[in-house]
Swiss-Prot record:
Keyword tRNA-binding: yes
Name the UniProt record assigns to this protein: Peptidyl-tRNA hydrolase
Organism: Xanthobacter autotrophicus (strain ATCC BAA-1158 / Py2)
Quaternary structure annotation from Swiss-Prot or TrEMBL: Monomer.
Similarity annotation: Belongs to the PTH family.
HAMAP family per record: Pept_tRNA_hydro_bact (MF_00083)
Pfam families: Pept_tRNA_hydro
Catalyses which reaction(s): an N-acyl-L-alpha-aminoacyl-tRNA + H2O = an N-acyl-L-amino acid + a tRNA + H(+)
A GO biological-process term: rescue of stalled ribosome
Gene3D superfamilies with a match to the protein in the record: Peptidyl-tRNA hydrolase
Length: 202
């Protein structure tokens, strides 16, 4: 069994925020693979189903970003899911827009959602890092991640969510490197190889 957790803040106020790209990617996976219906449990909205013949629970924590670990750990304990069967989809300031990377373990790069999960569950889960770019000044980060994606960003955002949905079966088959490679090729083919951040010159 696998746990796919999207990170974001609950409710319509935050739905379009850059910080919520993890929710958006997981929503695309749920639609594509018909996971559902959504039910309130584990301090989350949760959907269940199968991907590539494996049982998957998709988790949208309702704890707000900084307490995501409470929800993830509750579901993990209930189902006794090993850490290397957990994939967390989250926004990544240190990657350019439309870049996707996957890694197991490592630091939290200042991401409070990851910090919370690591504190509650341990470190050896997979992070699916979804690049949103950096505003260029640390003082601007808070406003940047809590602002909605610009209209001009929608094409690459949709493509990133499509890539996650298209290749989610590779995650359920424990083939994370192949997931990353296939997503990279897909985004390249869509013309999103070198995306600029909104407002970036170049």
């Amino acid at each position: 069994m696998f746990l796919f957790a999207g990170l974001g803040n609950p409710g319509p106020k935050y739905a379009g925020n850059r910080h919520n790209i993890g929710f958006m990617a997981l929503e695309a996976i749920c639609r594509r693979h018909r996971l559902g219906p959504l039910r309130r449990r584990f301090q989350s909205l949760a959907a269940e189903g199968e991907i590539a013949g494996e049982k998957v629970i998709a988790l949208f924590p309702e704890t707000y970003m900084n307490e995501s670990g409470r929800a993830v750990s509750e579901a993990q304990r209930f189902y006794k899911i090993p850490l290397d069967h957990i994939f967390v989809f989250h926004d990544e300031l240190d990657l350019p827009p439309a870049k996707l990377r996957i890694k197991k373990g490592g630091g939290n790069a200042g991401h409070n959602g990851l910090r919370s999960i690591t504190a509650q569950c341990g470190n050896d889960y997979f992070r699916v890092r979804l690049g949103i770019g950096h505003p260029g000044d640390k003082a601007l980060v808070h406003a940047y991640v809590l602002n909605d994606f610009a209209k001009s960003e929608k094409p690459w955002l949709d493509a990133v969510c499509d890539a996650c949905a298209d290749f989610a079966d590779l995650l359920a088959q424990k083939r994370p490197e192949e997931f990353q490679n296939r997503a990279h090729l897909f985004l390249d083919a869509q013309g999103f190889g070198e995306q600029k951040r909104v407002g970036e010159k170049g």
